[in-house]
Amino acid sequence: MCGISGYWGSDRRIAAQLAASLDTIGHRGPDDRGTHVANDVSMGMTRLSIIDLEGGSQPVYNEDRTIAVVFNGEIYNYRDLMRHLIAKGHQFTTRSDTEVLVHLYEEHGARMVTHLRGMFAFAIHDARSGCLFLARDRFGKKPLFYRAHGEGLSFASEIKGLKPYARAAGERWNVSQQAVADYLSLSSVPQPATIYEGVFCLPAGTYATFRDSHLDIQAYWSPTFSPKTSLTYTEAQRETRRLIGESVKLRLRSDVPLGVFLSGGVDSSVIAYEAAQVLGSTLQCFTVSTGGELDESDLAAQTAKLLGVQHHVLPLRLDPVEGLYKVVEHYDQPFADSSAIPSLQIAKLAAEHVTVVLNGDGGDEVFAGYRRYIAAANVSRLSWIPQPMAGKLAAKFGSHSRSRRSPLGFAARFARGLSMAPEERYLAWTSDMFREPDKAAHWVGPPVQATERLVADTLVAGISQLDQQLESDRRINLLSGLLVKMDMACMAESLEARSPLLDHTLAEFAWRLPDGYRVRRGTPKMVLRDAYRAVLPSGVTSGEKRGFEIPLNDWLSGDLKPLLHDLLGSPNARVRSFVDDSLITGLLSGTAFADRNRSYLLYALLVLELWLERESDDAAHE
């Protein structure tokens, strides 16, 4: 795992900032550093050593040094690819997965990416054809940002890595009004946009070629939901077990200490089970103890005892104020998922024991684990209900509970979305944030497009409502939310996170399962539960999804209250450039957003205010 950075262009002032750029992302790889400078390209990396500790330094070159690569990530099938390439006559000087990339590029050109199984973002300088080649993995687990500078191009693993190049070019970046509006609706800035105008994230599942001052981006992967498998339900369970076992085994390759994040949920328990089949009692599992009714450490302990593995329970003691400032510092963009605060601390605690962790991320998006997927599987049967009746049902349910997790809260959200268009329904079911009527009433910035356009872009003809919900989640909440949270939190502590359930081979199998295999008898993620029911505690396979719930209401009325009122209550609050005074006053007094949980939007505005404050301070020091 590494951080990468580079610049292609003739401006030597910009190229000279490579070292400064690498300094800003040094936390992603504290073990080593290397650079490649040739003609109009300067690129480098900071390395977190995982595979081939002695011989895996970068950049890596082909035999005649006409192709160079800097690479962030892991290629899990690199041994198979290496054998294939050696048989083709390629000569290897290391046993690292990085060297596979240069020889695979020689052999297949841009289509090399279709052979890779892993998480990655890398840059290849091809001196023979005079181009820069960039690529990113299918799900977007590893980030890669870029910006054009006249006829040149800079890239980096984090946005902060681009700023030294921008300063040398004399650039001042403008905050994107559209990105702010979308953030207030979604809790994060949706990729490929960023919070800055003119700064972009290379889309997941794409590669790009930069030649003659032109960047050409091409998609190489998109999921397939059909044809549906002909396997019986029992056969589907067996194949699920086989593919997960294979995915976990591939991700256990490491030359440094490795462990598993283990909660009381089925996803991480499945990963721990499969890892234990390979590593036995040497496997280390890490569980966070949060206290309170949502603490899953007892259930995780049952799983660990059953598997006979080493179990570390890490007590989580959160300071919301300190944690909030750390999120603003590390995440580069406004990010309003409050679980980012404990995620940073969990990564710090785990990094004291291991360098690599496996997690259960992606299980919900691959096997349909959220409760809204139950709604999606049934919406076509209930869409006949007229809007007025659906609205009355939503109001009735919502009057009893605004909690997103309560049965009545879920019923209210379901009823509210029944007669909506798919793009409106998606936002109604997934967010308590800024909606289009709110923008019409309270947005004071320049006109912006509706956030529904992002959902509309994910709509696929001819697939079920369940599959559509999964695809929208993959391209919005997973890509710009969960994966960003995990990458930034773990890399801040030089910890590599691997997600076996986001293996593309496994995901493509799961997405081709019939709806009734995934949501069965009103229970989400059923095929995964049933596949492991015989080998995991019943409380794991039969329990409801809890998630990593943060007591946000308590935080905002307790530890964060002084900060909240000092910053947002100030007439000079920077967020007042985007939303009007009446919204902020109403949120602080509790009169606005009476039909939903106002905490989410309040927290998002607080994060945005702190981010804007930090941005202003950074600009003042340039």
Residue positions per predicted region:
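Adenosyl-5′-phosphate
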Residues: M1-I4, A20, R167-R172, E197-A204, ...
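Hydrophobic alpha-helix feature that most strongly marks membrane-spanning transmembrane helices
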Residues: S185, L252, K305, E329-D332, ...
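Acceptor-substrate binding/catalytic loop of class I
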Residues: Q333-D337
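Active-site adenylate/phosphate-handling loop in enzymes that bind or generate adenylated species
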Residues: R138, Q345-R404, L482-L506
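Cysteine-centered catalytic environments shared across enzyme families
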Residues: M1-Y331, S343, A347, R533-A534, ...
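Short secondary-structure boundary/capping segments
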Residues: V328-E329, R371-N378, A620-E622
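Acceptor-binding helix/loop patch of EC 2.4 sugar-transfer enzymes
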Residues: I159, V379, R529-D530
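Residues that scaffold the ATP/ADP-binding catalytic core of kinase and kinase-like folds
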Residues: H84, Y165, V366-G369, F509
